[in-house]
Amino acid sequence: MPPIPSRARVYAEVNPSRPREYWDYEAHMIEWGQIDDYQLVRKLGRGKYSEVFEGFKMSTDEKVVVKILKPVKKKKIKREIKILENLRGGTNIITLLDVVKDPISRTPALIFEHVNNSDFKQLYQTLSDYDIRYYLYELLKALDFCHSQGIMHRDVKPHNVMIDAEKRELRLIDWGLAEFYHPRQDYNVRVASRYFKGPELLVDYQCYDYSLDMWSLGCMLASMIFRKEPFFHGHDNYDQLVRIAKVLGTDELYEYIARYHIDLDPRFNDILGRHSRKRWERFIHAENQHLVTPEALDFLDKLLRYDHAERLTAQEAMGHEYFRPVVEAHARANGTEQADGQGASNSASSQSSDAKIDGA
């Protein structure tokens, strides 16, 4: 019996209601800029699909980041470019400035705005309770914006969240795994990085949606408030689900699987065992207690849910009590009345409705 499909609780109809050229990235015609206008300065890092350099635009002396793509299918390159173009100007989304092609290797390179990033492994150890709330609220602005534009990021993790600690600015980067959401569509489960993979990916449930990003955000929140990086530390994709089950419980996992008629890989029979759901309070210790509040645990509990349809949406998350101090500070800075704890989002109006499961 096939799994029961599900549908996003919000923004489900964004792409079906837009012209085909908005989401049909395979038909997208790339407009190539002039590579001679850019000079590389130093290598910043490398990923599975690219090498990243700091550079500058010679005509303006403007600092830029240059992402040189490794040979991958043209379809994947077009998808990343189309998504970045669609999201250009969105709150806290890295800005794509230009697309150029190396004349010798024929390799495409993406030119981005420069962000003076702080290394997250050092930065996260110094963040106060308020800082964590502040930066997660900024990240939620980016997530609600991309979701409102019909796009799932599918690789939310600290490495893809650039923070300029001096300017207190945040950018969500690396849209190479991002995809357009279409209701009832099956997607590849080989996305996201292991420690941030939602249970839906680990049980091979393909009909997922934007809520995948909210699980990853929950993993980031847990690692930040408990000072445990990463929070779920699996040795492989199978062990990753075991680590989650040891915290969220195995009974709850089996309920989720039954609800969606998911067939669990037989390999889990030997390794899952039986585990009770743990209270979040058990992860508090002397070094992290200043970061853990009742509202932080309530917020975390509403993100780290097996059932993707039960997780808070980005817009709901922004309205959570956890962000009240941030919203109040925003309101004071803007000289407006305090917005009773509701996070104002710059997205399209929420199409929120009850969680839907077809045929349930």
From Swiss-Prot:
Its EC number is 2.7.11.1. It is found in: Cell projection, Axon; Cell projection, Cilium; Cell projection, Dendrite; Perikaryon. InterPro entries: CK2_alpha (IPR045216), Kinase-like_dom_sf (IPR011009), Prot_kinase_dom (IPR000719), Protein_kinase_ATP_BS (IPR017441), Ser/Thr_kinase_AS (IPR008271). Residues 338-354 have a biased composition (Low complexity). The keyword NAD does not apply. Expressed in a subset of the adult male sensory neurons: CEM head neurons, ray RnB neurons, and hook HOB tail neurons. Residues 38-323 form the Protein kinase domain. One of its GO terms (biological process) is regulation of cell cycle. It comes from the Eukaryota. Casein kinases are operationally defined by their preferential utilization of acidic proteins such as caseins as substrates. The alpha chain contains the catalytic site. May participate in Wnt signaling. Modulates two aspects of male mating behavior; response to hermaphrodite contact and vulval location, acting in the same pathway as lov-1 and pkd-2. This is Casein kinase II subunit alpha.
